[in-house]
Swiss-Prot record:
NCBIfam families: iron-sulfur cluster assembly accessory protein
Protein's name in the database: Iron-sulfur cluster assembly 2 homolog, mitochondrial
Keyword Repressor part of the UniProt annotation: no
Taxonomic source organism: Mus musculus
GO molecular function annotations of the record: identical protein binding; iron-sulfur cluster binding; metal ion binding
GO biological process, one term: iron-sulfur cluster assembly
Major site of localization recorded for this protein: mitochondrion
PANTHER family reported for this sequence: IRON-SULFUR CLUSTER ASSEMBLY 2 HOMOLOG, MITOCHONDRIAL (PTHR43011:SF1)
Amino acid sequence: MAASRALSLTAEAVRAVIPRRSGRLLAVFPRLLTRWETTSSIPEAGEGQIRLTDSCVQRLLEITEGSEFLRLQVEGGGCSGFQYKFSLDTVINPDDRVFEQGGARVVVDSDSLAFVKGAQVDFSQELIRSSFQVLNNPQAQQGCSCGSSFSVKV
């Protein structure tokens, strides 16, 4: 039964492309549209936190200068439907949430926060690559082996 449900979700074309308040586009599966519209309100204090690992804090302190911070965004795409995007930024928008730990800051817009609340941001350094990653995301059903894309829980 689960396999047939997964197949029907995969077979459905992405029907809705919703303009985000920030001007970016996010593709959403039709059944998720209602769920995210009803549950993506601004989180209350203590709800929807993003945790930073020690290695994330350390790396951010090494690479950021002045008012720079790490921006985490969720976009439609990747092999699992959604993907994480990391960038350094200096502008905090009205709909952004700022998560600070040990002097390092990660900023997430309210639309993306619905997809990553409760997750952990880490910095991983390996022989073949070094990157920021989202770990232990309670909103993600599964991810791909690259670690940059995921599908959301329905």
